[in-house]
Regions:
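Alpha-helical segment of the N-proximal tetratricopeptide repeat
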Residues: 8-31
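Start-of-helix register in tetratricopeptide repeats
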Residues: 11, 45, 79-82
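Short coil turns that delineate tetratricopeptide repeat
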Residues: 41, 75-78
Length: 110
């Protein structure tokens, strides 16, 4: 047991969230991911999936809000970089070009 759910139960909820995302039932994916985050607030996979869902809905302010603390992704450099890129895209969509340049510089893509 890893917490509130057994490990296989948590994996099942993650598979369900990803399935909903893949079939474009984004709101259902968000509900599943938020349930995971309610039980496991530091779950990097769930936080990243939430960002992807908001990006798919073109809810760029929510992408920015969820990625405000990029240190939450420090334990997984690949996820952190993809979240930084989605954050930069959201900033660009909202016309915050200086913030985009800063993010790209921080991840070595200037």
């Amino acid at each position: 047991m890893i917490g509130i759910l057994e490990e296989d139960e948590l994996s099942s909820v993650k598979v369900l969230a990803f399935f909903f995302f893949q079939i474009r039932h984004i709101e259902s994916s968000i509900r599943a991911v938020k349930a995971i985050l309610a039980m496991y607030p530091k779950d990097i996979w769930a936080r990243a999936m939430l960002v992807r869902c908001f990006d798919a809905l073109e809810n760029y302010q929510s992408v920015i809000d969820v990625t405000d603390d990029m240190m939450l992704f420090d334990s997984n450099p690949e996820i952190k970089k993809s979240m930084a890129l989605l954050r930069a895209r959201a900033m660009q969509k909202l016309g915050r070009n200086e913030a985009v340049r800063k993010i790209l510089s921080e991840i070595g893509m200037n």
